[in-house]
Regions:
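Helix-to-loop junctions at the C-terminal end of transmembrane segments
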Residues: 188-201
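Glycine-rich segments within core transmembrane alpha-helices of 12-TM secondary carriers
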Residues: 18, 38-64
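Hydrophobic core of transmembrane alpha-helices in multi-pass small-molecule transporters
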Residues: 5-19, 230-236
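Extracytoplasmic gate region of multi-pass secondary transporters
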Residues: 131-186
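C-terminal membrane-cytosol helix-exit motif in multi-pass small-molecule transporters
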Residues: 64, 98-117
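C-terminal transmembrane helical hairpin of 12-TM major facilitator-type secondary transporters
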Residues: 200-236
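Juxtamembrane intracellular "pre-TM" segments in multi-pass secondary transporters
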Residues: 113-137
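Intracellular juxtamembrane helix-capping segments at the cytosolic ends
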Residues: 19-33
Length: 236
């Protein structure tokens, strides 16, 4: 019964976190020597991305029982699936992380250092006339954009293409595997910074772009007409 505009508002507010993430990434290079900037950025970005995997892993678990101190909130009732009529505490997935978010915000306020801004608003707007701005934007959409987008729809894609309500009707649940995509991506991002420091970021961006193109072509081929468990394993 929740209005759609409420969900959009909540999504927008959560997006502030994504904006803050993108905003502080460029400043990392100011606090580390250039020879270690790839490692620093990889660790910072990878650990940040790891939060997506954590919520997708523990979220379904937290929804299965009433949290201590929060049982005064009425649970929802499942209306379809194998557990019709059973209680589910959907709000637990958000409430559990509220204290951690507050702690992180306080620590950031105390310990993070600001990068001095020397350019005025007009000077900052000059980036839009620089072709490199648009080249980097395209690269960012290709890499992090695809990572975050596919991580968000990974579970839904499994349900729609292979799950019990799909034409294949396999006994698989997207929520069981949803955390794997962002987990693998985050680990690779954390560990690959050191290789970028040694070989350069351009070559690895090129390699990742080629690898993503090949992988996407393979996924499209599998999802075009999946026939059973074999296609599911290939997709995974």
């Amino acid at each position: 019964t929740t209005p759609y505009w409420v969900l959009l508002t909540l999504a927008f507010m959560c997006g502030i976190g994504g904006g803050a993430f993108s905003g502080y990434m460029p400043s990392t290079g100011y606090f580390f020597p250039k020879r270690l900037s790839g490692t620093a950025l990889g660790l910072q970005g990878g650990i940040g991305n790891l939060g997506m995997s954590v919520i997708q892993l523990v979220g379904p678990i937290l929804m299965g029982f009433g949290l201590f101190g929060m049982t005064w909130l009425a649970p929802q009732t499942q209306v379809k699936g194998d557990h019709v009529g059973e209680s589910i505490w959907v709000y637990n997935a958000a409430e559990f992380f509220i204290p951690w978010c507050l702690v992180a915000a306080i620590l950031a306020f105390i310990w993070l250092r600001d990068v001095p801004v020397k350019a005025n608003i007009k000077q900052q707007l000059d980036i839009f006339s620089n072709p490199n701005t648009w080249y980097m934007t395209i690269l960012y959409v290709m890499t992090f954009g695809l990572f975050s987008g596919f991580s968000a729809v990974f579970g839904l894609l499994i349900n729609n293409q292979f799950g019990r309500e799909s034409s294949l009707a396999l006994p698989v649940l997207g929520a069981t595997f949803a955390f794997l995509g962002p987990l693998i991506g985050s680990i690779i991002r954390m560990s690959w910074g050191i290789f970028c420091d040694r070989m350069g970021g351009a070559i690895w961006t090129f390699i990742s772009g080629v690898g993503m193109a090949i992988t996407l072509a393979g996924i499209a081929w599998v999802l075009y007409n999946p026939t059973g468990w074999t296609d599911f394993y290939i997709f995974m």
